[in-house]
Amino acid sequence: MSEEISLSAEFIDRVKASVKPHWGKLGWVTYKRTYARWLPEKGRSENWDETVKRVVEGNINLDPRLQDSPSLELKQSLTEEAERLYKLIYGLGATPSGRNLWISGTDYQRRTGDSLNNCWFVAIRPQKYGDSKIVPSYLGKQEKAVSMPFSFLFDELMKGGGVGFSVARSNISQIPRVDFAIDLQLVVDETSESYDASVKVGAVGKNELVQDADSIYYRLPDTREGWVLANALLIDLHFAQTNPDRKQKLILDLSDIRPYGAEIHGFGGTASGPMPLISMLLDVNEVLNNKAGGRLTAVDAADICNLIGKAVVAGNVRRSAELALGSNDDQDFISMKQDQEKLMHHRWASNNSVAVDSAFSGYQPIAAGIRENGEPGIVNLDLSKNYGRIVDGYQAGIDGDVEGTNPCGEISLANGEPCNLFEVFPLIAEEQGWDLQEVFALAARYAKRVTFSPYDWEISREIIQKNRRIGISMSGIQDWLLTRLGNRVVTGFKDDFDPETHEAIKVPVYDKRAIKMVDQLYKAVVKADQDYSKTLGCNESIKHTTVKPSGTVAKLAGASEGMHFHYGAYLIQRIRFQDSDPLLPALKACGYRTEADIYTENTTCVEFPIKAVGADNPNFASAGTVSIAEQFATQAFLQTYWSDNAVSCTITFQDSEGDQVESLLRQYRFITKSTSLLPYFGGSLQQAPKEPIDKETYEKRSQEITGNVEEVFSQLNSDVKDLELVDQTDCEGGACPIK
């Protein structure tokens, strides 16, 4: 018989009385609008103590030993661990991923096995559905179908996850010839609330339905699975292997899909109506019909994935994260975003990267693209497959199933595998009296329990049980090292030569104290995983550590994001709110400057003055002042001594540094597993999200703020259910989902 661990009200009251959450300037506001779930019985959204209780209980009860009449000793031990986790997270010395903050401990988590993982990877090639929650009725479970990876991507995006996908030549070449062009008819009942809007985007009334012997009719249920299955059927009808009857007309009936604005239970939010799905299905069919008698290219497959992502964004999930990974010599793929019409229509939906190995040398066209628009990014699959931390040396096939990454690039992943993240703010945790080795051990155990979720897809269950991959990240890295060391980790550069090309290079010199600090913490994570894996009788995690880009979660604690340098020593951070957002009156009452958003109607832009941790330190550097060379070197430091997965980093560069991109990509080809770059804009845009300011302006603007937003909001009692978020970003490069 299974039993559940719960935290007592008395314990929580003691923590609230003794621990003060380390809210950043944007922290509580970011939390309230992003992670606080609605409590219908109380007519308000959660408070922070309630969120942390839900999250910790949702996680601790994943320990599989609780499923079989646990002993009192075990229950006591896990309760004590839950209490330590609660205290740690409540104080913001560490947090699980934003996905866990939103979903852990909910009914949606219990129903949906995939719900706790942020991001996934899938290879775009014919695959079997297997013993999964979604299997088209016309397929056997072991039958390979072209639709399967697109179904996986569509399903995970609608659950709020991000998906990396590979359209590398080795995958696309496995897709058979497109045998048929399909006549697609989308129908909606004339009595549907969505009828007029649906007809405008290409549907027809049900009275116009003409069915014959050559047609297939499918009435979509009003479910996520229904959307996925409709797209799967459309794709598979184009291929003789999955259309043996050679049917060439498909009628999809969307009459049952709930109208725009209707409530969505589970993940939350409101429905979009059938219109985004109608547009998507027509567009996907056009891509496939255009290749009838021929083969799909990497660009075609990426287009289908982007069209799916676009539909998901227009639907309930307001941000859809995709990373398209292509072959490094596929010029059509590399240049696909140069088609401005298609870029504006759907190709914006993914960040694009190319797969390389350490022998690759063709960086010139890649560097040119990066200077132009920040793409493509680089993913070194050879390093990912054969190395953990670089300092630990070559380990042939240590992660041999790797084929790609999640959208932010910090976790190398096999087909169907998710990332599984937990984030520690080492400076904050130390300031709150924590032993960092205990903190990182708690983090490892938290992430390990997530691997025992009942996953919906067979490919995911199998690879998770094999790899048990976790990704323990640290954030506020620049804050921590600058405060503890008094300087940045890169203390200088020395002259050297590339061992293969013999080019002159500048090799970074690292502070040896920093090497020791991160090495000890890495070993603490590995030891905790080894011990817990032995206790649970499961495989040790194939890899353990990472640096996630962070963003929304880092804002909670007011820390620098992942390994990134603060955007400026002093900033105006602009956050956009719907005009109806209940936080706006509280923000205005506290003196924050607001103005109408110039880009979006019914939206207000709120300005928050921010001072970076360590801004007054003479060795402080911001993204606007740190060199491109030091950023590459810092990423290499973390890949060498901390992360056995990868290090997510968006390196920013000034116009004057653009000519260094190619040589630095080449210099670090034996160290960097993934990287991306963007030109530094410095707040030159109107109402820029981040605008560097000077100290005097910061102090003046700070004096205008006279109240505590949390207290004023509570006094106004103006909470609202299911408010749509606008303008949320969860990482430096914009690749992560909102939650």
Swiss-Prot record:
It holds the Pfam family RNR_Alpha. Allosterically regulated by ATP and dNTP. Disulfide bonds join C119-C419. Residues 685-724 are annotated as: Adenosylcobalamin-binding-2. Residues 565-626 are annotated as: Adenosylcobalamin-binding-1. GO terms for molecular function: cobalamin binding; nucleotide binding; ribonucleoside-diphosphate reductase activity, thioredoxin disulfide as acceptor; ribonucleoside-triphosphate reductase (thioredoxin) activity. The active site is at C408, E410. Its EC number is 1.17.4.2. GO terms for biological process: DNA replication. It catalyses: a 2'-deoxyribonucleoside 5'-triphosphate + [thioredoxin]-disulfide + H2O = a ribonucleoside 5'-triphosphate + [thioredoxin]-dithiol. Keywords: Allosteric enzyme, Cobalamin, Cobalt, Disulfide bond, DNA replication, Oxidoreductase, Redox-active center. Its cofactor is adenosylcob(III)alamin. Residues 168-313 are annotated as: Effector region-2. Residues 147-158 are annotated as: Effector region-1. NCBIfam families: RTPR. Monomer. Belongs to the class II ribonucleoside-triphosphate reductase family. This is Adenosylcobalamin-dependent ribonucleoside-triphosphate reductase. It comes from Lactobacillus leichmannii.
